[in-house]
């Protein structure tokens, strides 16, 4: 969008002073705000409500606004934090429950990240769970990465953004949604009515009538649009409906012709979308009215902030610009005087660091898979952009340091009203970013080396073929995708070397990746899973397992292969739904109880036994999975449900021990560590946590000692049920990946040691744990560590197993337990000596073979000659092959070129190239020569100009590869010698 002509109410230019880079001047009519602090007015509740705000009613009215009133609204604080607060207050005053943003890591398995405000309400829209409130409002953190290349280039593309939304679950519908959207826009936010346009679905006459007759929007500013633009669907079938969008007009003076295009982003910006979920689309394409009509809306915070703050683009709002100002300071440039390329780089870094900070805060660490790859890719793009701005090191004198942590600190400083938990995790977030940046800088160096190699290869091939040298598009994409090398930089370096790039091939690879990204990020699917049908019309299961291990219950449903049945007999695999159960269903990292369902025989029913091996939850319905061991089970019959008490005790011990482990970790290595996953099993516990290095032996010992001391203190556990807000205020830690009821959560406390929100089963007293032992600590991903441990009965079994192993080891080595270490070290030393002796013998044998074949060397050239030897040495390993080549170079007269190959074992090829100084001086390099030969054997390699090694996996191709090496050497050397 070209903003050079945008008047935006004739906004004044914003002065940027490098001495005060965080200052933002919005307008003389708006509150001035700096990035260093939050306007105090944001924290204060309104003392009065405007008469224009109408209480929630089925007959909403829109009041006319006087010019004085409009000026009053426009003079309000329009900082991003204030806009967010005003939106939530607006809908709270109309009966909406204000709910917190959900995590960027969604519970929905169909999407990688939270991409829309409606995602946390998807089960309600599907009718899978009952609504807890009739309507709600949120400010949802969102991530979208399907259009990364446009970030920073357009006025409003982002990876991280906030979506303000109001939602109705069968409460109000189209009329109220439309009128409140208009009130919010023109009265609360004071947008001039003649600048707001609306779009509707082409067949939605109801929406047209509301906009025209009840709201009063002129017909020329209501645009009917087709299904592609204004009809929302969740997939081929399922909930769907028309939508209506609000657009802001930057140029009303251009008129209201029929051919006005709302997609013209030089004139319009869409800022509010209203989805009227009123139909169910059947398999045959029919639209059936939904019994419960829903409303799903989204207003982009960054977009409305751009409009209200009167700045040319989203990036210059107070939500993002303070971050840009910090980056400008690090780069020692002025944003206002920077060229377009530099401005784009500043915007990209600011945008990506917002996304990275909130993703890491929500438990996503950089890695090569899934969400972790998103974080890694964003950090790498930010590092590259920083390099293009001339940012070296941390800009504090350390050229090998990282600059992104300073940017992250600014993001965290602005996070108070987006996610208050971010500041509590600041040290971990910053450290993960620092480590990833430093790691990538090393990768970038390797990428530069690879580019140099690829360009040399391109020039070498062109020299032989007499064609124009070019870099393959796949190679350019490899540099971009794996090493984070911008194609623009690749093109610049290539041009300097006289090499062009196959951009068509590069674009093909980019498009393939883009399609994959869009498939993973672009759609929120509303589909009713099979388990929803399985449990339809079944009441919630009453859980009795905290207080009892057995209970009488009634069979409500039986399922075989997901289909309901009335009766199952011996040998059947079955899923049993009961009205009440003592069985704990797998959740919160704790595995499910095992046990039995018994049916006693009497005059009316047959005796039966069902062995339960797993219990899962579908919402609040427990599904007992097992096998009928004897007899038959029928719907409606009464059973005795009995949990295996020994296995339950093992789970309880390991679950409480997990809580103690988290507390000990925080005490020993720092409060910033946080849980990233867990497993509570019968035989062990596993705890994943965010940390950037391995734990030292003394730290592990201290953790063990702390936990065993707490166990010895014999402290009674306390459990209580509290509102979520009260539990958090009390200091309770939330478990990773869990979603909590706002009104009621279970708190498990070991007084003075640990307090966590937890629905799992626990011991009554820490003494029941008996003992605790860490059995391993390792890294499982970048920034993620894992501890495995045993406690209670599993601890005793572990110790007994170790004792048994030691007894067998002592018997084998014929030493006492205290002498095992010395004996093993002596054996290892003897083994090393034997291996060295064997290696020396192999090398001597290879050297002997080399001496024998040296007479096969032939000469190339006439006036000046070079000796060439290309031979196969069967059954010679790579090290011995190297020794043979070194011997030949030292014994044959310079200049000499030697290439040797071998297949030392099945599916393995070893190659070596050794060129004397006389050959290298002609410009023939071993490192470059060996690569194409190795490719023929299904491998690769490289090295120095005088010596290189390579390998492969196709020994059957070795003879032809060596023949190719012989031909190429002769041709190349003949040409060099003239």
Swiss-Prot record:
Compartments (UniProt record): Plastid, Chloroplast; Mitochondrion
A GO molecular function held by the record: alanine-tRNA ligase activity
Record key words, sorted: Aminoacyl-tRNA synthetase, ATP-binding, Chloroplast, Isopeptide bond, Ligase, Metal-binding, Mitochondrion, Nucleotide-binding, Plastid, Protein biosynthesis, RNA-binding, Transit peptide, tRNA-binding, Ubl conjugation, Zinc
Pfam families (alphabetical): DHHA1, tRNA-synt_2c, tRNA_SAD
Key word tRNA processing present: no
Gene Ontology cellular-component annotations: chloroplast; chloroplast stroma; mitochondrion
SMART domains hit by this protein: tRNA_SAD
Cofactor binding comment, as recorded: Binds 1 zinc ion per subunit.
Disruption phenotype: Embryo defective. Developmental arrest of the embryo at early cotyledon stage.
Catalyzed reactions: tRNA(Ala) + L-alanine + ATP = L-alanyl-tRNA(Ala) + AMP + diphosphate
Cross-link (Glycyl lysine isopeptide (Lys-Gly) (interchain with G-Cter in ubiquitin)): 773
Entry's Gene Ontology BP terms: alanyl-tRNA aminoacylation; embryo development ending in seed dormancy
Positions contributing to Zn(2+) binding: 655, 659, 758, 762
Matches recorded under InterPro entries: aa-tRNA-synth_II/BPL/LPL, Ala-tRNA-lgiase_IIc, Ala-tRNA-ligase_IIc_anticod-bd, Ala-tRNA-synth_IIc_core, Ala-tRNA-synth_IIc_N, Ala-tRNA_ligase, Ala_tRNA_ligase_euk/bac, Ala_tRNA_synth_plant
Cofactors demanded by this protein: Zn(2+)
Record-listed E.C. numbers: 6.1.1.7
UniProt family annotation: Belongs to the class-II aminoacyl-tRNA synthetase family.
Domains (record comment): Consists of three domains; the N-terminal catalytic domain, the editing domain and the C-terminal C-Ala domain. The editing domain removes incorrectly charged amino acids, while the C-Ala domain, along with tRNA(Ala), serves as a bridge to cooperatively bring together the editing and aminoacylation centers thus stimulating deacylation of misacylated tRNAs.
Subunit structure: Monomer.
Its job: Catalyzes the attachment of alanine to tRNA(Ala) in a two-step reaction: alanine is first activated by ATP to form Ala-AMP and then transferred to the acceptor end of tRNA(Ala). Also edits incorrectly charged tRNA(Ala) via its editing domain.
Descriptive protein name: Alanine--tRNA ligase, chloroplastic/mitochondrial
Gene: EMB86
């Amino acid at each position: 969008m070209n903003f050079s002509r945008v008047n935006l109410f004739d906004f004044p230019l914003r002065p940027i002073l490098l001495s005060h880079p965080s200052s933002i001047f919005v307008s003389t009519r708006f509150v001035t705000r700096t990035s260093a602090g939050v306007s105090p007015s944001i924290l204060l509740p309104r003392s009065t409500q405007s008469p224009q705000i109408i209480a929630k009613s089925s007959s909403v009215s829109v009041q006319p606004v006087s010019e004085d009133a409009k000026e009053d609204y426009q003079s309000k604080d329009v900082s991003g934090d204030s806009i967010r607060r005003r939106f939530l207050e607006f809908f709270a005053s109309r009966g909406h429950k204000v709910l917190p943003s959900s995590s960027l890591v969604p519970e929905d398995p169909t999407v990688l990240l939270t991409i829309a405000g409606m995602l946390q309400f998807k089960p309600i829209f599907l009718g899978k769970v009952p609504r807890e409130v009739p309507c709600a409002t949120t400010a949802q953190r969102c991530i979208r990465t399907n259009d990364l290349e446009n970030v920073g280039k357009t006025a409003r593309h982002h990876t991280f953004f906030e979506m303000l939304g109001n939602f109705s679950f069968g409460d109000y519908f189209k009329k109220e949604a439309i009128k409140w959207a208009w009130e919010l826009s023109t009265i609360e936010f004071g947008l001039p009515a003649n600048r707001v346009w609306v779009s509707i679905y082409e067949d939605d006459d109801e929406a047209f009538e509301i906009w025209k007759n009840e709201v009063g929007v002129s017909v020329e500013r209501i645009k009917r649009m087709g299904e592609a633009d204004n009809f929302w669907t969740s997939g081929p079938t399922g909930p769907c409906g028309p939508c209506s969008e609000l657009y802001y007009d930057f140029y009303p003076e251009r008129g209201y012709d029929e051919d006005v295009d709302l997609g013209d982003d030089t004139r319009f910006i869409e800022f509010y979308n209203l989805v009227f979920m009123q139909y169910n689309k059947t398999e045959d394409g029919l639209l059936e009215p939904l019994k419960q009509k829903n409303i799903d809306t989204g207003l982009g915070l960054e977009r409305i902030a751009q409009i209200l703050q009167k700045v040319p683009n989203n990036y210059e709002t107070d939500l993002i610009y303070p971050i840009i100002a910090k980056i400008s300071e690090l780069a020692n440039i002025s944003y206002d005087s920077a060229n377009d390329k530099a401005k784009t780089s500043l915007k990209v870094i600011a945008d990506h660091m917002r996304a990275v900070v909130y993703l890491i805060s929500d438990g996503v660490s950089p890695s090569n898979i899934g969400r972790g790859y998103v974080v890694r890719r964003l950090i790498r793009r930010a590092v590259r952009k920083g390099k293009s701005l001339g940012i070296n090191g941390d800009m504090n004198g350390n050229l090998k340091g990282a600059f992104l942590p300073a940017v992250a600190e600014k993001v965290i400083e602005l996070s108070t009203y987006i996610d208050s938990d971010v500041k509590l995790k600041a040290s971990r977030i910053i450290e993960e970013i620092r480590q990833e940046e430093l790691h990538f800088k090393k990768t970038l160096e390797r990428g530069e080396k690879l580019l140099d190699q690829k360009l040399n290869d391109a020039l070498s091939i062109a020299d032989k073929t007499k064609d124009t040298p070019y870099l393959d598009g796949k190679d350019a994409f490899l540099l971009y995708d794996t090493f984070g090398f911008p194609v623009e930089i690749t093109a610049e370096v290539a041009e300097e070397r006289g090499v062009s790039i196959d951009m068509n091939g590069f674009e093909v690879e980019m498009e393939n990746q883009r399609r994959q990204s869009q498939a993973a990020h672009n759609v929120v699917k509303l589909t009713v899973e099979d388990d929803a049908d399985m449990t339809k019309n079944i009441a919630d299961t009453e859980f009795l397992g905290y207080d009892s291990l057995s209970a009488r219950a009634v069979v409500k449903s039986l399922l075989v292969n997901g289909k309901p049945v009335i009766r199952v007999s011996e040998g059947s695999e079955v899923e049993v739904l009961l009205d009440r159960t003592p069985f704990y269903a797998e959740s919160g990292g704790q595995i499910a109880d095992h046990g039995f369902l018994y049916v006693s025989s009497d005059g009316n029913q047959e005796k039966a036994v069902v062995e339960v091996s797993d219990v899962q939850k579908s919402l609040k319905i427990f599904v007992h999975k097992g096998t009928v061991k004897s007899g038959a089970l029928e719907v409606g019959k009464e059973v005795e449900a009995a949990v295996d008490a020994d296995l339950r005790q093992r789970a309880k011990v390991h679950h409480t021990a997990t809580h103690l482990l988290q507390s000990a970790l925080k005490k020993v290595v720092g409060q910033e560590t946080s849980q990233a996953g867990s497993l509570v099993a019968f035989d062990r516990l596993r705890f994943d946590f965010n940390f950037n290095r391995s734990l030292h032996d003394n730290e592990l010992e201290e953790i063990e000692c702390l936990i065993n001391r707490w166990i010895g203190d014999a402290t009674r556990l306390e459990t209580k049920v509290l509102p979520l807000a009260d539990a958090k205020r009390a200091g309770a830690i939330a478990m990773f990946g869990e979603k909590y009821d706002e009104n009621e959560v279970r708190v498990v406390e070991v007084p003075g040691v640990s307090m966590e929100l937890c629905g799992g089963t626990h011991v009554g007293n820490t003494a029941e744990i008996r003992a605790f032992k860490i059995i391993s600590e390792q890294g499982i991903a970048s920034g993620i560590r894992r501890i495995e441990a045993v406690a209670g009965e599993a601890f005793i079994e572990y110790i007994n197993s170790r004792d048994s192993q030691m007894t067998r080891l002592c018997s084998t080595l014929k030493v006492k337990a205290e002498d095992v270490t010395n004996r093993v070290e002596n054996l290892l030393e003897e083994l090393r000596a034997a291996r060295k002796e064997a290696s020396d013998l192999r090398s001597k044998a290879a050297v002997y073979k080399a001496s024998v074949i040296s007479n096969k060397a032939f000469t190339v050239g006439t006036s000046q000659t070079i000796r060439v030897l290309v031979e196969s040495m069967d059954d010679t390993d790579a090290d011995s092959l190297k020794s043979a080549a070194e011997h030949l170079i030292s014994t044959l007269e310079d200049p000499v070129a030697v290439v040797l190959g071998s297949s030392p074992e099945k599916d393995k090829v070893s190659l070596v190239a050794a060129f004397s100084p006389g050959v290298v001086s002609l410009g023939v390099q071993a490192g470059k020569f060996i690569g194409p030969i190795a490719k023929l054997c299904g491998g690769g390699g490289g090295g120095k100009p005088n010596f290189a090694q390579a390998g492969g996996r196709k020994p059957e191709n070795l003879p032809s590869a060596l023949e190719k090496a012989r031909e190429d050497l002769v041709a190349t050397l003949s040409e060099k010698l003239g």
